[in-house]
UniProtKB/Swiss-Prot annotation:
Protein name listed in UniProt: Phosphoglucosamine mutase
E.C. number: 5.4.2.10
Assigned protein family: Belongs to the phosphohexose mutase family.
Catalyses which reaction(s): alpha-D-glucosamine 1-phosphate = D-glucosamine 6-phosphate
PANTHER family to which the protein is assigned, alphabetical: PHOSPHOGLUCOMUTASE (ALPHA-D-GLUCOSE-1,6-BISPHOSPHATE-DEPENDENT) (PTHR42946:SF1), PHOSPHOHEXOSE MUTASE (PTHR42946)
Entry GO CC: cytosol
Length: 449
């Protein structure tokens, strides 16, 4: 991670850390790095519903125009919508203004290259070096050399038309679908998409006012949708996050269906229809043990990566896999889009329900989730804690006792002085006992008083 770019673009409190002055520089320098080989480069910009989106969009646009780029404003649209349109419209770059599931005061800036994928570490480092350069040596066109800005709000409809082509069913008639749009980027798009497929749509979390994004709604608060599904008698509930790159579902009984379960359902269907490349699914180390056991029972292989959808995508690109994702609901169908896509995932899930004629509770119930417990221990040195002999010893002892019927994962936090201890076992009691046993040793050996 660099000075400005984290694991998912540039993020910070809008107008304090992520200022319009910085956004102007990011637009100018980022635009230059991504478009320097084009004579009249085209850059797309989309945003979620945060109040700060207009301010940052204006600054980014000014920076881009100042290097001679042509800017197309997409308005409110999902992150995967920007990724798809960047490639589909032949743009040199796409930019999304969003902080995803973060609180409203935060915002972020995320770039996509001409292929629709997020930037490489090298490209981000080049942009950062230009931002921090003592002297601005970038082009300063004048007159007709300056860029122009145009609105392309129909981009959202172009994206929805594309999404509809990815499913086998003609429509979802006869199905009642409850949507929770997190008062975010999918608020208009998702409702239109499913209504256009003749579903009976009921919607919550679709009244953005600039301040209520993710507030008690969306994929990080699926309990709100669970109650809504039962109240409305819906067949399925679909919860998106603020920028629309995640999906968490709810079955007809009000049970939450997470990313692992959704991936399992999709992997099984793709294998049955001969479309699962290399019979393999890519997930992160945080996926549930029950997920791997369910895949194994279907003859499906799995590959694990570090936590973060960018690592999942890297692995998929490198080895030619077409399905991957995270328990949190970032699910990537690489045949159709270059990033996690909540609406695309929702379509695939409902498509499978309709084709199989089975309720979501039955489809998701094929995967038995192991109880999972995560405990954080504050330590003086998280890296040294991982090398401590007593810590290593207790982890080995616990793994031996589990004997394949459980799993333990001990790793340093990426952002805080913490060691995260996660265990899965056949019962919650066993889970707690294993986690506390390891946590006690970590506290004793490396903990902060």
């Amino acid at each position: 991670m660099g000075k400005y770019f984290g694991t998912d673009g540039v993020r910070g409190v809008a107008n304090r850390e992520l200022t319009p002055e910085l956004a102007f520089q990011i637009g100018r320098c980022g635009g230059y790095v991504l478009t320097k080989s084009a004579e009249r480069p085209k850059v797309l910009i989309g945003r979620d519903t945060r109040i700060s989106g207009h301010m940052l969009e204006g600054a980014l646009v000014a920076g881009l125009l100042s290097i001679g780029a042509e800017v197309m404003r997409l308005g409110v649209i999902s992150t995967p919508g920007v990724a798809y349109l960047t490639k589909a419209l032949g743009a040199q770059a796409g930019i999304m203004i969003s902080a995803s599931h973060n609180p409203v005061q935060d915002n972020g800036i995320k770039f996509f290259g001409p292929d629709g994928f997020k930037l490489s570490d090298e490209q981000e480092a080049e942009i950062e070096a230009l931002i921090d350069s003592a002297e601005d040596m970038l082009p300063r066109p004048i007159g007709a050399g300056l860029g122009q800005v145009n609105d392309y709000f129909e981009g959202g409809q172009k994206y929805l038309q594309y999404l509809k082509q990815t499913i086998d069913e003609e429509d979802f008639s006869g199905m009642k679908i409850a949507l929770d749009c997190a008062h975010g980027a999918t608020s208009s798009l998702a409702t239109y998409l499913f209504a256009d497929l003749d579903a009976d749509v009921v919607t919550m979390g679709a009244s953005p006012n600039g301040l209520n994004i993710n507030e008690g709604v969306g994929s990080t608060h699926p309990e709100a949708l669970a109650a809504f599904v039962k109240e409305k008698g819906a067949d399925v509930g679909l919860a998106f996050d603020g920028d629309g790159d995640r999906l968490i579902a709810v079955d007809e009984r009000g049970n939450i269906v997470d990313g692992d379960q959704i991936m399992y359902i999709c992997a099984k269907y793709l294998k049955e229809t001969g479309r699962l490349k290399q019979q393999t699914v890519v997930s992160t180390v945080m996926s549930n043990l029950g997920f791997y056991k369910a895949l194994e029972a279907q003859g499906i292989k799995s590959v694990q990566t570090a936590v973060g959808d960018r690592y999942v995508v890297e692995e998929m690109k490198k080895n030619g896999y077409n399905l991957g994702g995270e328990q949190s609901g970032h699910i990537i169908f690489l045949d159709y889009n270059t990033t996690g896509d909540g609406m695309l995932t929702a379509l695939q899930l409902v498509n499978i329900m309709k084709i199989k004629g089975k309720p979501l509770s039955e489809l998701a119930g094929e995967m038995k989730k192991y109880p999972q417990l995560l405990v954080n221990v504050r330590v003086a040195d998280k890296e040294k804690a991982m090398e401590n002999e007593q810590v290593k010893k207790v982890i080995q002892e616990v793994e031996a006792e589990m004997n394949g019927n459980g799993r333990v994962l001990v790793r340093p936090s990426g952002t805080e002085p913490l060691v995260r201890i996660m265990a899965e076992a056949q019962t919650e009691e066993a889970c707690r006992a294993y986690v506390e046993r390891i946590a006690d040793v970590v506290r004793r050996e490396m903990g902060v008083e």
